[in-house]
Amino acid sequence: MFEKVNRSGLIIYLYYNRDAKKLQDYGDITYHSKKHRYLQLYVPTQEVEQLVGRLSKEKFIKKVRVCHIQELETPFVGNLYR
């Protein structure tokens, strides 16, 4: 049966858009901005620290940031319409 795997997002800034194909082996690419040359990569939470260190050393990557979407509170209270 299907088991839920906790995943964390990484925002990876690239020098060239053509290097995005090289990152498919590391995790799931959910978004790629060709204009701003970054992509969002989802990886298992246990591997985040190792991957940030490994990806930061790659020559085709400008910067790696960890996405903090899991730290936001999602139960919204109140009316969304004004």
UniProtKB/Swiss-Prot annotation:
Subcellular location(s) per record: Cytoplasm
InterPro entries (UniProt xref): DUF2129 (IPR016979)
Record has Cytoplasm as a keyword: yes
Alphabetic keyword roster: Cytoplasm
Keyword RNA-binding among UniProt keywords: no
Pfam families: DUF2129
Main location: cytoplasm
Top-rank taxon, per record: Bacteria
Gene Ontology cellular-component terms listed: cytoplasm
Family: Belongs to the UPF0298 family.
Protein name, UniProt field: UPF0298 protein SPD_0651
Organism: Streptococcus pneumoniae serotype 2 (strain D39 / NCTC 7466)
